[in-house]
């Protein structure tokens, strides 16, 4: 009873903080960025991280098993993973690009998990026999950490593509205007050229930063995903007598692994870095959501215990 009440309190606190942080983000987005407000939102995410940590520990103690047995618990852990990735650049103060992705990801995931949509599966139940194994922590935690890192890295690649597309589009339109004006304003040609060069330099620097951090975060996520798949195969052999059963979840996890293996391969080729490898990562972003969330909507296969309740099928 005590643990249930504590869990209920932590859930409401985290949801309230998330709501406040979302409001702050909207204000700083619509109005010129206010440093104090932005810093408050960053601290709010850190407080949310500790609330989620307390929620996971409380649920673990009350249920007697690590809280990764259903969709609700995995969403909470996914939000915790986003928050963990977010905290590292926050304290380093020099990786603001990454925090721009991890912050909103943690907020939205936690907001969805603690909203009323998944009320029916908030209560922790008894583990099905297949999940009563020490491999639960190793396999599922590695998979969720992998999803979190890969999603963050993929979003950085999406941002890279958007900026590159806008850059090419604006350069084409502005070059025409610049050439036309040059005939009438010959004395301003040098000043205009200097302005465009400076602007393009900073944009190129941003694209390089996005590409660099996308590669690093995806490499980390790929490592987690690989460990998760291998540990899952060992667990499957112990539980079902086979390392691989081509279950829908297993199949899509394998597809996810292949897509990001292709990304890492293209990223090592200098001619394919930047937009080309970012396209592969962007495709991977969609594949991850199909693997993690889409398969759960079907509620079929050996991993159906993690699906939505019957009212959503």
UniProtKB/Swiss-Prot annotation:
Required during biogenesis of c-type cytochromes (cytochrome c6 and cytochrome f) at the step of heme attachment. This is Cytochrome c biogenesis protein CcsA. InterPro entries: Cyt_c_assembly (IPR002541), Cyt_c_biogenesis_CcsA (IPR017562), Cyt_c_biogenesis_CcsA/CcmC (IPR045062). PANTHER family: CYTOCHROME B_B6 PROTEIN-RELATED, HEME EXPORTER PROTEIN C. GO terms for molecular function: heme binding. It comes from the Eukaryota. The chain crosses the membrane at residues 9-29, 44-64, 71-91, 111-131, 143-163, 217-237, 244-264, 278-298. May interact with Ccs1. Keywords: Chloroplast, Cytochrome c-type biogenesis, Membrane, Plastid, Thylakoid, Transmembrane, Transmembrane helix. It is a multi-pass membrane protein. The gene is ccsA. GO terms for biological process: cytochrome complex assembly. One of its GO terms (cellular component) is chloroplast thylakoid membrane. It is found in: Plastid, Chloroplast thylakoid membrane. Pfam families: Cytochrom_C_asm (PF01578).
């Amino acid at each position: 009873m005590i643990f249930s009440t504590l869990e209920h309190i932590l859930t409401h606190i985290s949801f309230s903080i998330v709501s406040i942080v979302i409001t702050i983000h909207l204000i700083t987005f619509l109005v010129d960025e206010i440093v104090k407000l932005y810093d408050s939102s960053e601290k709010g995410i850190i407080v949310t991280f500790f609330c989620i940590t307390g929620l996971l520990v409380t649920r673990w103690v009350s249920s007697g098993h690590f809280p990764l047995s259903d969709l609700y618990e995995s969403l909470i852990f996914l939000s915790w993973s986003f928050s963990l990735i977010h905290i590292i650049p926050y304290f380093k103060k020099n990786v603001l690009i990454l925090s721009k992705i991890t912050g909103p990801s943690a907020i939205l995931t936690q907001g969805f998990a603690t909203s009323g949509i998944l009320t029916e599966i908030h209560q922790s139940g008894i583990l099905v026999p297949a999940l009563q194994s020490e491999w639960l922590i190793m396999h599922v935690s590695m998979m969720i950490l992998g999803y979190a890192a890969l999603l963050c890295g993929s979003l950085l690649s999406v941002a890279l593509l958007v900026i590159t597309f806008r850059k090419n589009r604006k350069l084409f339109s502005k070059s025409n205007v610049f050439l036309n004006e040059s005939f009438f304003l010959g004395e301003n040609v040098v000043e205009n050229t200097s302005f465009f060069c400076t602007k393009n330099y900073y944009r190129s620097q941003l694209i390089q930063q996005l590409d660099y951090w996308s590669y690093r975060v995806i490499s980390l996520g790929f490592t987690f995903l690989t460990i998760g798949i291998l540990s899952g195969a060992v667990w499957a052999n112990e539980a079902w007598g086979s390392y691989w059963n081509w279950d829908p979840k297993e199949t899509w996890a394998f597809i996810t692994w292949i897509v990001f293996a292709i990304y890492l391969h293209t990223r090592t080729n200098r001619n394919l870095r930047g937009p080309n490898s970012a396209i592969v990562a962007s495709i991977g972003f969609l594949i991850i959501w199909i693997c993690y969330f889409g398969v759960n909507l079907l509620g079929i296969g050996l991993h159906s215990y993690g699906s939505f309740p019957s009212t959503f099928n």
